[in-house]
Swiss-Prot record:
MF terms in GO: metal ion binding; nuclease activity
Role summary: Transposase-derived protein that may have nuclease activity (Potential). Does not have transposase activity.
Chief localization: nucleus
Tissue and organ distribution: Detected in adult eye and in embryo.
Entries under PANTHER family matching the protein: NUCLEASE HARBI1-RELATED, PTHR22930
Organism lineage: Eukaryota, Metazoa, Chordata, Craniata, Vertebrata
Enzyme Commission number, as recorded: 3.1.-.-
Annotated family: Belongs to the HARBI1 family.
Binding site for a divalent metal cation: D149, D199, D225, E261
Protein name (record): Putative nuclease HARBI1
Organism encoding this protein: Xenopus laevis
Amino acid sequence: MAVPITVLDCDLLLYGRGHRTLDRFRLDDVTDDYLVTTYGFPRPFIDYLVDLLGASLSRPTHRSRAISPETQIMAALGFYTSGSFQTRMGDTIGISQASMSRCVTNVTEALVERASQFISFPRDERSVQGLKDEFYNLAGVPGVLGVVDCTQVNIKAPNSEDLSYVNSRGLHSLNCLLVCDARGSLLWAETSRLGSMQDNAVLHQSELSGLFETKMHKQGWLLADNAFILRPWLMTPVQIPESPSDYRYNMAHTATHSVMERTQRSLRLRFRCLDGSRATLQYSPEKSAQIVLACCILHNIALQHDLDIVSESGATSLEPEEECVHMEPLESEAYRMRQELILTHFS
């Protein structure tokens, strides 16, 4: 059960009643264009979040200066979409960095409590088949339940001696495991793995791996690049294609897998706090992982509201990550299954 949280206006204590504080901000006082330009989302989306999170962000209080759920959400959206507690967001709604930080923490926790409501694989047979059909329509690969990949999100160094979060580029980060559908909606998100871990190790240690090993492998498979090991439920490209069928399969695999690249770009374009080219998340690894997950949840809610990222102009390009290519066991069950897939559908 969600625990209601009250956030008090720290700016009243810092500046007195003459200071313009967050609880004076009203959605009705600004235009729709202003909301989209400043906070990244239109009014109906923000209203939906207020209805969704309001009970978790407020409770009866004898203090008159408690920050309302509406304005807490605006503060958090301002951070997610700009990546900064300072300047633009602070000036826009007139609060201190401390107040912004507390609002971000509380909204993030309220979203994370609802993760399973917005990020999950379909369960009923009709929805599962619809998922496969949408992937098949992309490039002709049958049986696909999702596209899986990992992405690095930069964070501040936990401490000077801990190298477990240092990735292959020498930066402290989280290695986040994502699965998306054909539209780019996230079906799975694990955001707390160490930046030093290889992608295949992240998948191997995840709950997702156990889920497919025990149950979902009977329904279909995921697609992944060659940073992952070929498995009966995880189809990777042919490393050394020899036949026209191999090449056709690889081309279809690449075309299907590209939906994950677009999804990652959309996340970083919409939520600038994840864009490592600007800054790193200035939180502990645990809180940073929650922020990443909150952004994933908001990404899915945005898609439910038909708020796709229309233009990618100005988007940061994804930096190529070092790929550890694994040798393919030619006699494995997974290899035989992929060969059967290629012969049946790409010959």
